[in-house]
UniProtKB/Swiss-Prot annotation:
The keyword Membrane applies. This is Photosystem I assembly protein Ycf3. Transmembrane segments: none annotated. The lineage of its organism: Eukaryota, Viridiplantae, Chlorophyta, core chlorophytes, Trebouxiophyceae. It is a peripheral membrane protein. Keywords: Chloroplast, Membrane, Photosynthesis, Plastid, Repeat, Thylakoid, TPR repeat. PROSITE patterns: TPR, TPR_REGION.
Length: 167
């Protein structure tokens, strides 16, 4: 049984009902409806920390979805799960894929920056100052682009950029 049919969470259930109504009235193909259903179930599983189930749903949605913009959000969410699981290399791959399809995705740019900043901190702790500088510069590049797209977001990143002279 699909997650959307067994969900006890009121907000998720409300979202599911509204999404089902929209899918019925909007002119979409059955394949697009299936892709959205898998995506929705993936989001629900992800919000409950059921990452393996979420990934299964996202991969199925990715298989069915043909629209590049919609695929970018599926790829972004897969990246989020890999970030949560500590697999930063894999997460970066999915964030980059999301940006290839949708260059105006500031949250992917931000998450890439966060990973590079984290790696910069690790390099600094290992006394690899040159590598840390390169990683921090890379993080700054991605944060500047994210901030350009969403100027009122990422306040901590803006402060870090100013404090480090990278803004």
């Amino acid at each position: 049984m699909p997650r959307s049919q067994r969900n006890d969470n009121f907000i998720d259930k409300t979202f599911t009902v509204i999404a089902d109504i929209l899918l019925k009235i909007l002119p979409t193909s059955n394949k697009e409806k299936q892709a959205f259903s898998y995506y929705r179930d993936g989001m629900s599983a992800q919000s409950e920390g059921e990452y393996a189930e979420a990934l299964q749903n996202y991969y199925e949605a990715l298989r069915l979805e043909t629209d590049a913009y919609d695929r970018s959000y599926i790829l972004y969410n897969i990246g989020l799960i890999h970030t949560s699981n500590g697999d930063h290399a894999r997460a970066l791959d999915y964030y980059y894929q999301a940006l290839e399809r949708n260059p105006s995705l500031p949250q992917a740019l931000n998450n890439i920056a966060v990973i590079y900043h984290y790696r910069g901190e690790q390099a600094l702790e290992s006394s690899q100052t040159e590598i840390s500088k390169l990683l921090f510069d890379k993080a700054a590049d991605y944060w500047r682009e994210a901030i350009r797209l969403a100027p009122t977001n990422y306040i901590e990143a803006q402060n870090w950029l100013k404090m480090t002279g990278r803004f």
